[in-house]
A protein has these predicted regions:
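Conserved alpha/beta-hydrolase "acid-adjacent" motif
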Residues: 232-241
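Primarily recognizes the serine-hydrolase "nucleophile elbow" in alpha/beta-hydrolase
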Residues: 114-186
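Short beta-strand/loop motif that positions the catalytic acidic residue
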Residues: 225-227, 231
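Catalytic histidine-centered segment of alpha/beta-hydrolase-like enzymes
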Residues: 261-271
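Catalytic nucleophile-loop/oxyanion-hole region of alpha/beta-hydrolase
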Residues: 68-78, 89-129
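N-terminal cap/lid segment of alpha/beta-hydrolase-fold proteins
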Residues: 4-51
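Mobile cap/lid helix-loop segments that gate and shape the active-site cleft of serine hydrolases
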Residues: 19, 35, 182-215
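Short, surface-exposed "cap/lid" segments of acyl-processing enzymes
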Residues: 46-53, 57-80
Length: 285
C-alpha cells in the first residue's frame, strides 16, 4: 500500500507569517522565450539579509495541459507563498491549443525553470533550493521535471536533456496526473493525455515513455503527492499508483490526503492548500 500521511496545518511547523502589507510583495515578470506564453512572474517577499540566499517555489498551474487555462490559476498561490516569506516563480507555458503539446510544453517547463539561473544573482536565489508546487496537470509537469536527469542518454526524451539545467530539490504535487498510462486508459478529461502528446500510446510509445513520471522512477528527491479526498477531477489512483511505485529504490514519495475537492488545493484560504504551503516550506528547509 502507498505510504499515506494524514496531515493538517496544526501538525506541521508554521511558516513565517505573511507580510504586514500585501503590496510589500514585489512582482517581476520575465520572458524565457519569444512566444507570448513563455514567461514567468517572480513574487518576492522582503529581501534576505545581506549575503544570504533564498530558495524559490516554482508554481505550475493545471488545466489538463489545455490553453483554456493559464497562469492566472497559479497567481493566488504565488502571492500567498510570498506573503509567507517564500520567493515564488509562477510559470506560464505553451499548452495544447496555443502552440504547446509534444514537445513544446515539456521544453517550456524546463526552460522556464532554467530561467531562474539567469535571475538568481539579481534576486539572491539559491539554485540548490528550487522546489515546485504543481496542481493537476501542473503536478504532472512538476514531478516530470524533477526527473529530468533520466532524460540523458539515448533513451526517450534525449532531445530534452540538458545536463546544466536547474534541478528541482523536491515537489508538492496537488492531485497531480502522475500516471499517464492510467490516465489514458481512463480517458481523463475527454482524451487530455492524447491531446497533449498528439495521439495514443500505441501511436507514440516513445513520447509516452518520456512524458510519464512513472518512467523516471526512482527519483533522488522527495515528492509529496497531496490528494484531495473529494477530488472528482483527478482520481486518487493518479497519486497512489505513483507513490506505490516509488518505493523501489530512490527517495520514496508520500501520499498526503487532505480534506476538500480538486480546487480547494489551490484556494489559499482552504486547509487543503495550507498543507501544501507547509510542505513547500519544509522542502525549502
Amino acid at each position: 500500500m502507498p505510504d499515506r500521511l494524514q496531515l493538517s496545518p496544526a501538525r506541521l511547523p508554521p511558516t513565517p507569517g505573511p507580510c504586514s502589507l500585501w503590496h510589500m510583495v514585489q512582482r517581476l515578470k520575465y520572458s524565457y522565450g519569444a512566444d507570448p506564453s513563455q514567461w514567468g512572474e517572480l513574487f518576492l517577499p522582503d529581501p534576505p539579509a545581506a549575503g544570504q540566499l533564498r530558495g524559490v517555489v516554482v508554481v505550475i498551474h493545471g488545466g489538463y495541459w489545455r490553453s483554456t487555462y493559464g497562469a492566472e490559476l497559479g497567481e493566488p498561490l504565488a502571492v500567498d507563498l510570498a506573503e509567507h516569506g517564500m520567493a515564488a516563480w509562477n510559470l506560464e507555458y505553451r499548452r495544447a491549443g496555443n502552440g504547446g503539446g509534444w514537445p513544446a510544453t515539456f521544453q517550456d517547463v524546463l526552460a522556464g525553470i532554467d530561467k531562474l539561473a539567469e535571475l538568481a544573482g539579481q534576486h539572491s536565489l539559491d539554485l540548490g533550493k528550487v522546489v515546485a508546487v504543481g496542481h493537476s496537470a501542473g503536478g504532472h509537469l512538476a514531478v516530470w521535471a524533477a526527473g529530468r536527469g533520466h532524460l540523458a542518454g539515448p533513451g526517450p526524451g534525449a532531445e530534452l536533456a540538458d545536463p546544466g539545467g536547474v534541478r528541482l530539490a523536491g515537489v508538492v504535487s496537488q492531485s497531480g496526473v502522475l500516471n499517464l498510462a492510467e490516465a489514458e486508459r481512463l480517458n481523463l478529461s475527454n482524451g487530455a493525455v492524447a491531446n497533449l502528446l498528439g495521439g495514443s500510446s500505441s501511436e507514440f510509445p516513445r513520447r509516452y515513455r518520456c512524458a510519464d513520471p512513472m518512467a523516471a522512477l526512482p527519483l533522488d528527491v522527495p515528492v509529496y503527492a497531496v490528494h484531495a479526498e473529494a477530488d472528482d477531477d483527478v482520481p486518487l489512483a493518479m497519486s497512489a499508483l505513483y507513490v506505490d511505485a516509488s518505493g523501489a529504490g530512490g527517495v520514496p514519495a508520500h501520499l498526503v490526503m487532505v480534506p476538500g475537492d480538486h480546487f480547494d488545493l489551490i484556494n489559499p484560504k482552504s486547509p487543503a492548500y495550507a498543507v501544501c504551503r507547509e510542505l513547500a516550506a519544509r522542502l525549502l528547509g
